[in-house]
Amino acid sequence: VLHSCQQLEQMGFEVTYLPVDESGKVSLSDIENAITTKTILVSIIMVNNEIGTIQQIAEISKLIKRVASSYNTSILFHTDAVQAAGYLDLDVKRLGVDLLSLSAHKFYGPKGVGCLFIKRGIPFEPQQAGGGQERERRSGTLNVPGIVGLGNAIELAESRRNMAVIHCSNLRDKLIKALVETIPGTKLNGHAVDRVANNVNVSF
């Protein structure tokens, strides 16, 4: 996402980058203050891939809609949910997102394939021109094994999500406790509570 934003800047778009606090959380007030009448898209990563901090996506969505309404405009909301699949609820209606991206290998699917949820009614143009595949939304011969593998993998990950969260969070918490108690000066990086179940990041 970062490199895509940098590429958009080179094309003439104005991009605003927001800071996070020491736990990796983005402030709702910072988001609100950054939105202007020219804002067309907000993109927030759901789970930080390094420190595991979980952002409050549903609350951010409500904020964006409220501010957009006050400006009498519409703002699209995208979340990069790559690190969240298999551990967090990705119900797009509950989250209130317009766009959500996933990568199959993060939930034990095949490498080299991902998916993008686009809310019905949102117009978009393909990145590549060519054949009429996928109703002219993506040119080129479809990677059928990859697509089927992604679909099956996310179904399996979702069916085992609750069990995986309990198992991984227990192991995570035991490891954090052991590190803190055993190695003096150990510092947990990321949010202590709003943290994905399969992440431990510490500094010594």
What are these regions (language model features)?
Residues 1-204:
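Pyridoxal 5′-phosphate
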